[in-house]
Every structure is written in C-alpha cells, then in structure tokens.
Amino acid sequence: SKVVCLNSATAAEELNLRVCGIQEGDEVIVPAYTYTASASAAIHCGAKVIFVDSQKDSTEMDYDKVAEVITEKTKAVVAVDLGGIICDYDKLYAAVESKKHLFRAKEGDSLGARIQQSIGRVIVFADCAHALGASRNGKMAGEIADFSDFSFHAVKNFTTAEGGAST
C-alpha cells in the first residue's frame, strides 16, 4: 500500500538505497548476471559493489556465495527477479541471517541509521523490473524483500513507456 513512482526503476533503486543510508564505504552485494542498473544505483550512492556468481544452471545468484562475501561493511544485497522468476528469498534471508553477527548499523538518528538499526541485518532489496505480476510460494513480487523496485520501461511486463516504482 506504500508506493512511490519515479522516472525509472534505476531511480527507484537508488532512492531505496539512499533512504536506507547506503553511502561511501558500504558494500552492496549484486548478482553478476543482471542489467547494469542493479549495480550502478549502488555506485551512485558511493558504495562498493560486490558481485556474486549465479548458481549452476540458473540465473539466480548463489546464496551460499552471498553468505561468504558478507563482511562488516556489507549493508545491502540486491536480488534480481529476472524474467518473471522470483528469487528464492527464503535462501537469501537465511544467508543474510547467518551473518547477522557481522552487521554494523549506522549510528545516529538519521532515517538511514534508524532503518538499519530497526532491521538489524543486511537489508534485502529486490530488483523486480522483470517480475511485475509474478509470484513464488504465494507471495507476489514486491512483497518479499525489505525494499523493492519495479520498471515500467517499454520492454517490461507492464509499460508506461518509461517510469518506475519503489515499494
């Protein structure tokens, strides 16, 4: 029920990252198999992108490798729901929870710090640009991750020629 519309999914992802206080010195995990915008939004925030390979015979990122690359600098992981196939968020959340002890939320009272303190672990973002209307295990794209973004570009499932949304 809470949606912000923007000019693109890239802008929506960058907004989500900035609202959560992602900045220079932070690490953001992104799948190696994705569109450039999944990583460039983090770069625009000044964060270092850590790429994770896909699973064998799948476009989904390898969740064991996600857990392996989480450090004290990791603040976010961006899952990409590609071609209407929603990532296995149960496995992704398990990977993130297994490294919860490494998470260091920002200090202070800024919105980003409060969000990080409230969540208390690496924040899970979903790039749902190719998944509007898709579901997995009874949950729709956009309602599984902590923050999600959608695209309404001309080649997407639902188009307005351009545009994006953040949930």
What kind of region is each of these model predictions?
Residues 4, 29, 50, 123-125, ...:
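Structural detector of well-ordered beta-strand residues that form the stable sheet scaffold
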